[in-house]
Amino acid sequence: MKPKAVLIGPPGAGKSTIGRRLAQALELELVDTDAEIERTTGRTIPEIFTHDGEPRFREIEESVVRDALQATDGIVSLGGGAILSDRTRELLQGHTVIYLEISVAEGLRRTGANNHRPLLAGGDPKVKYQELMRRRRPLYRRSATIRIRTDGRSPARVVGQLVSKLQDK
């Protein structure tokens, strides 16, 4: 099996919302890897980060991503930091990977002071988000086969564009 598409992007880009709506529009299953991690471990992502650390979280995430890519022909939505793993980027090769692009300002507006996002907790949220994007943006761009901006666009409009692009594939 091979997913119809894999969604990547930073926190606040709309991966969960767009993923859910895109799956509905295409009448496909959605696999949200963050939700799968929580389901399979019985813990929240912040709990895993706090008790086991980011390296262990990324190992769990790699395994969940691998399983999701093998087990569904639907839509797979990855956590924002999944792209940091060399192994995960290797797993994405040969798949339709959609990068949901967003500006730092819009990403900050959408995520706010969300303390459920471990890598944005503590310190100046703007500085943290800018650093996160500086590090991840090149990885998102290299991994993507389709790029679409979500700033100032309704989820319905983004999904409509993606449905058109995916039907052309």
Curated annotation (Swiss-Prot):
It holds the Pfam family SKI. Mg(2+) binds at S16. Keywords: Amino-acid biosynthesis, Aromatic amino acid biosynthesis, ATP-binding, Cytoplasm, Kinase, Magnesium, Metal-binding, Nucleotide-binding, Transferase. It catalyses: shikimate + ATP = 3-phosphoshikimate + ADP + H(+). It is found in: Cytoplasm. CDD domains: SK. Its cofactor is Mg(2+). PROSITE patterns: SHIKIMATE_KINASE. Binds 1 Mg(2+) ion per subunit. GO terms for biological process: amino acid biosynthetic process; aromatic amino acid family biosynthetic process; chorismate biosynthetic process. Pathway: Metabolic intermediate biosynthesis; chorismate biosynthesis; chorismate from D-erythrose 4-phosphate and phosphoenolpyruvate: step 5/7. It comes from the Bacteria. Monomer. Belongs to the shikimate kinase family. Catalyzes the specific phosphorylation of the 3-hydroxyl group of shikimic acid using ATP as a cosubstrate. This is Shikimate kinase. It comes from Rhodococcus erythropolis (strain PR4 / NBRC 100887).
